[in-house]
UniProtKB/Swiss-Prot annotation:
Expressed by the venom duct. It comes from Californiconus californicus. Keywords: Disulfide bond, Ion channel impairing toxin, Neurotoxin, Secreted, Signal, Toxin. The keyword Secreted applies. Probable neurotoxin with unknown target. Possibly targets ion channels. Residues 24-33 form a propeptide. GO terms for cellular component: extracellular region. One of its GO terms (molecular function) is ion channel regulator activity. The lineage of its organism: Eukaryota, Metazoa, Spiralia, Lophotrochozoa, Mollusca. Disulfide bonds join C41-C58, C46-C68, C48-C73. Residues 1-23 form the signal peptide. This is Conotoxin Cal9.2a. The cysteine framework is IX (C-C-C-C-C-C).
Amino acid sequence: MNCYLILTVALLLTSAMTGTTTAGQLNKKGVTLREDDGFPCNAGNCACLPLDSYSYTCQSPTSSTANCEGNECVSEADW
């Protein structure tokens, strides 16, 4: 019984210490990307990660970024 407990704890610690994010990789600004790492918006738009969501929304670069994480909308060049 104790072996199963030790094995479970070891697996959980290994998983926690790998430093991976749930969505995969990070871009150069530290924003969590989608699994495919492709820019999610059409050319000319920027990707905003809303404060209350895990999915990016696309918007015009001139739109307000008040609801975006880090108060920024990431352009395709910065993705």
